[in-house]
Amino acid sequence: MFSFDIAPIWDKIAHIQSSCEAALKLSEPGVAPLDPARDVEVLHPKMHPPKKGFSSAEGQARMLHDLANIELQAMELGLRTLVEFPSAPVGFREELLAVTVNESEHLAMCLEGIEALGFKWGQWPVHNGLWRATDVEDNILDRILIVHRYLEGSGLDAGDTLIRRLEGTEGKFTIQKIVKQINYEEIGHVDFGSRWYREICESKQIDWASDFPARMDSLRTRLPKRLEPINRDLRRKAGFTEAEIIYQEELRLDFLKPTLDAQKKA
């Protein structure tokens, strides 16, 4: 049994290291569940209750709850890749183990922050949107692009915006410390994806500069729509080229277009 088969959140965290180590020993691809086990209600984001502002403890706890859900899925997606791609380069898999364990540490930080504010994990529903963006038919380059370059890359943009929104909020220091530490360490996670995407492309004699936009075009219909402005500085630190940043900016505008068109008609 792997960590994504376990429902209780703290048990998931306790088993992630051993799950990753077991996955490293696989010689054949393992099977991941359609959805990971959960001890909380899972609903589509449109069905979630409205959120309170960051000026309240509840609003801050809800934000950490949402962030915990993202870190939880990031942790499980790392394990999923280890389970489903046993033939990936050894260096990639060993480094991914460390990244995945680090995601579990981020999750624990969020859960402890929620409790410090007087709330509990499961007090609000969660979604499985990040997990559902991946598919059993993915190849290793698809998976790296989806998880480490798109989802986690978008998280850098959102995290920076979140840090600025927390400025001036009562009790901000503890919350900001958590968000800042996570966002700083996520730069390394995204850079991990950037480096290995290019290295694996080169090992397969694929031109990564042309593969990036082509592969993104083929995957974009199942990606969650990220609308935060692209943080160019953080993206560069995480290994994105200028052409890749421009692509992300244009993709964001495409995602925003229906909203902008509706506003023009109003």
Q: Where in the sequence are the language-model features?
A:
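Non-heme di-metal
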Residues: 1-266
